[in-house]
Structures are given as C-alpha cells and as structure tokens.
C-alpha cells in the first residue's frame, strides 16, 4: 500500500506509527496472499503463478520503497527541528520549556530511526517468504 496522497504528518509519532502500520499491511498478509494466489504443484495448471508472483513482487517493491521514503523524510524533518532547537537552546540556556521540547524531539527522532531497523526486519521476512514460494515461478530483475 502506498502512502496516502499529500504530505505525511511527522509531528505526532503515534500518527507516524499508525501510518506505517497501515502501509505494512501487504507484508503482514504475505503468507496468506501467497497461499491463496500461488498454486501448489497439484493446482499448477489452473493459475499463472509467474504472473501472480510478478504482481506480488511489484506490490512489495512499491510498498517497501514508499515506506522507506516516508521514514527517511520524517527523520529528515525531525532532525531539522532538533537542529533548530539546539541552536535556540545554545542562545538561551535557562529556558526549561525549550529544553523539554528539545528532549521530546530528540526522543521522537530516535524512535523514527528505530523504525528503519523495524523496516529492515519486516522487509527481510517478506522477501524470505516470497522467495520460498515464488523462486520457481518468477525471477526478480538483477538490478533491484
């Protein structure tokens, strides 16, 4: 699933996480998808498994690229906010409200960065399952 049209709200981490959860639906359902669309040997003649695997491959690639873009975009936005708050903090060391905002943004940035690790695990799992079922029917392009 691609990201919703328009820009992604990176301000609230809970919304960011919810968006990623929705965008990871294809990965969460890959086993079911493969079981219902890629035939076993006994049903091989009834469905074009190579076309089905190709379509699933393209959907997975699009979802992974889209999520990677969303995560990295939010990391960049939050990093810019942290940088700005640090600069303000250097000018005004006594402002406790500013310090709290800085700490909050730094924490959010760390959580967003950890989503890159989660993404790697999710992607690896999906490709492992995909390759187990589709390697006989479809060979992905070498450049991807």
Curated annotation (Swiss-Prot):
InterPro entries: MIX23
Residues found modified as N-acetylalanine: 2
A Pfam cross-reference name: MIX23
Domain of life: Eukaryota
Coiled coil: 82-120
Residue positions, PTM N6-acetyllysine: 100
Alphabetical UniProt keywords: Acetylation, Coiled coil
GO cellular component term of the entry, any: mitochondrion
Family: Belongs to the MIX23 family.
Name recorded for this polypeptide: Protein MIX23
Biological source species: Mus musculus (Mouse)
């Amino acid at each position: 699933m691609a990201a919703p049209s328009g820009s992604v709200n990176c301000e609230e981490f809970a919304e960011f996480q919810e968006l990623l959860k929705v965008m990871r639906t294809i990965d969460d359902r890959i086993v079911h998808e493969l079981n219902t669309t890629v035939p076993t040997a006994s049903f091989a003649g009834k469905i074009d498994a190579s076309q089905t695997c190709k379509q699933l491959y393209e959907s997975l690639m699009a979802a992974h690229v889209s999520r990677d873009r969303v995560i990295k975009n939010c990391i960049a936005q939050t990093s810019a906010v942290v940088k700005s708050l640090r600069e303000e903090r250097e000018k005004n060391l006594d402002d406790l409200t500013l310090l709290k905002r800085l700490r909050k943004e730094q924490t959010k940035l760390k959580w967003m960065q950890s989503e890159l690790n989660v993404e790697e695990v999710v992607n690896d799992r999906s490709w492992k399952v995909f390759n187990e079922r589709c390697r006989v029917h479809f060979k992905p392009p070498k450049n991807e």
